[in-house]
A protein has these predicted regions:
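Beta-strand-rich modules
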Residues: 279, 304-317
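Sec-dependent N-terminal signal peptides of Gram-positive bacterial secreted proteins and lipoproteins
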Residues: 4-30
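Short glycine-rich His-centered loop
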Residues: 42-66
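Hydrophobic core positions of the immunoglobulin-like beta-sandwich fold
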Residues: 270, 302-305
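Short beta-strand segments within Ig-like beta-sandwich modules, predominantly Fibronectin type-III
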Residues: 292-299
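Solvent-exposed loop/turn segments flanking beta-strands in beta-repeat/beta-sandwich domains
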Residues: 271-290
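Active-site-proximal helix/loop segments of hydrolytic enzymes
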Residues: 32-44, 67, 71-252
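Pro/Thr/Ser/Gly-rich low-complexity, intrinsically disordered linker/stalk tracts
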Residues: 246-275, 309
Length: 317
């Protein structure tokens, strides 16, 4: 399971600066060239619009308008996908993009085939008690594969925060254990919901987002009535997911030609990225697995005085 991206509200492009050494140029000299580095593996999010085809989900009529859950879920998911794809470092898939039926097992199997880091089932709620209203997010329990549960809980909280900000009643983040005593291989209680349980077996968190109650007049007419209001829900989901993964909007600083100074230090410069609170400069020896953070700055330039002639380095900003 992929860990959270560690760059938040800062420049999100990888840039390579090679300090070319012995064998290519005379010893003792420092030479610099800037190139675009290979992209890091993206975060993979699979959105699952609930129901579809013959499975309509909840269906209620208010003030002469019929609210069909399967249609609402799909509209919210499409907006969420569009919004998420504005961020750098994320790949988004949907289990269905039209009005068709997909089994619960195939929904999770699809996510597994795409090597998902997070599975988000998009739903709306219903109750026999028509006064019930508000939003909640279900996440995996803390038993079997505890890290899946803890990551899912954090992702759920991030999404729920955004939904609450829209004015929906905050019904919190919840988990639900099997009602029939089912157990995981380690004998801990199994999750109740199939997509959450199957996702845990597959190794990634599965969430169910219940946006609003189709069975409640005010929820339906205030939050589910029309494309603009459904888009707000999709944007809220995307914002919550982006904040959980620390994604940034897909804007990249452009590295100017590096300057090798007389003292053999190297000066980097890049353009301003709107919305970036700061920039982090990382360096590693070419071919090494890990980067070392050199500096965190609000400026759009940095001079590295720690380079050694004869060594190749790679930088990220």
């Amino acid at each position: 399971m992929k860990k959270k991206v560690q760059m938040k509200k800062m420049a999100g492009v990888f840039l390579t600066l090679a300090i070319l050494g012995i064998g290519l140029f005379p010893p003792g000299n420092v030479y610099a060239a800037a190139n675009q580095a290979p992209d890091a593996d993206p975060v993979v999010v699979v959105l699952d619009p609930g129901h579809g085809g013959h499975d309509q989900g909840a269906r209620y009529k208010w003030d002469g308008k019929t609210y069909k859950e399967k249609q609402l879920n799909l509209a919210i998911a499409k907006t969420c996908k569009t919004e998420l794809e504005k961020y750098a470092g994320v790949k988004v898939y949907m289990t269905r993009s039209s009005d068709r039926f997909v089994t619960l097992g195939n929904r999770v199997n699809f996510a597994k085939s795409r090597k998902a880091d997070l599975f988000v089932a998009i739903h709306n709620n219903a109750s026999l008690k028509k006064t019930d209203h508000g939003a909640c997010v279900y996440y995996p329990n803390s038993g079997y594969k505890e890290e899946v549960g803890s990551e899912g809980k954090m992702a759920a909280a991030s999404i729920q925060k955004q939904l609450g900000a829209l004015g929906l009643k905050n019904n919190g983040i919840l988990y639900r254990n099997s009602a029939v005593g089912a157990r995981y291989p380690d004998k801990s209680k199994a999750d109740y919901y199939a997509v959450i349980k199957r996702s845990k077996y597959a190794g990634f968190p599965g969430l169910i987002v219940e946006h609003a109650y189709v069975s409640n007049h005010d929820d339906s007419t205030t939050f589910l009535n029309g494309n603009d209001r459904l888009k707000r829900l999709g944007v809220a989901d995307a914002t919550g997911i982006a904040e959980y993964f620390d994604l940034i909007l897909d804007q990249a600083p452009v590295l100017q030609t590096p300057v090798v100074n007389a003292d053999e230090s190297v000066t980097l410069a890049w353009n301003t990225v709107q919305g970036a609170d700061y920039y982090r400069i990382y360096r590693r020896i070419a071919g090494a697995k890990t980067y070392v953070c050199l500096e965190e700055t609000e400026e759009t330039g940095y001079t590295d005085t720690g380079v050694m002639p004869g060594t190749s380095y790679e930088y990220t900003v």
